[in-house]
Amino acid sequence: MKNTLTALLTALAVSTTALAQTTTDTTRPLLIVTSFLPIQSHTLAIAGQNAEVVQLLGKDAGPHDFQLSPSDVKKLAEADLFIINGAGIEDWLDDLVKKSSNKDLVIVDSSKGVDLVESPEEVAIAGGHGHHHHQGDGGNPHIWLDPVIAQKQAANIVAALQKAEPANAAAYAENGAAYAAELEALDAEYRATLAPLPNKNLVSFHDAFPYLSARYGLNYVGAIAEFPEKDPTPRQLASLVDKIRELQVGVLFAETGYAPGLLEKIAKETGAKVSSLDTLEVGQGGAKAYLERMRKNLSSLQRAFGRDE
């Protein structure tokens, strides 16, 4: 993966003449709007000082519960690019584009080329069925929580910025290569830290971690709620408690930004501990935000799985 990404980004740096030309206003920096935190962080790292990068979602909003406002539409009025995670999580995208007066806006889907997974039958144990995010896409959209997939998303962003502004193509490729190396280092840290740990049963607040679990050998038992803002019914809750007891799950992961009351109630009934994982859906930050918050998640996993269940 490392050699492939390095070769790809190096090739992008020297092949600017092959890029399609676009008509951006050269009197101002490229103006980029991103959907939410992971995409904002990737784009800031790649753009550097060569573009203005603005996040659409405010610091307290997440993509699941985002409510479109006139000020959000206004943010896109002058933008050259709108970079999204894709995979269906921005299900308000069509409405946003429809209301925007910016007919020259280029939408960049950073999930291009990523294979989506269906949540397995046992994952949405609160509902007793597979959790289908945004059924038009037919897959789980939380791809950014896998650092290897994040490398693919970053490469897609590099290519989009080079196409939009060929004059800075080499700078975008150089920044992209440096960022790819940081993502590769993050992946290596996850592998080295998690591989030797026992008891890697993961029950999360909502169904955000199938990609991370598959990448690093975690047993993704299930999710508490179908969406972060939707609690299970009493019948679903009883089924969930039975499942946790049956599998002897020792740790339940609350979600940063949401009250852990429901998980604490389940933990009291089952004897499990409560820890916390960050989906990175809520908040704002700089070019290092993705790396920093993913490392905090790694520390949480290390502490939780290091316990004897």
Name each region found by the language model.
Residues 1-20:
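Gram-negative bacterial Sec-dependent N-terminal signal peptides
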Residues 20-309:
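Extracytoplasmic metal-acquisition and chelation regions
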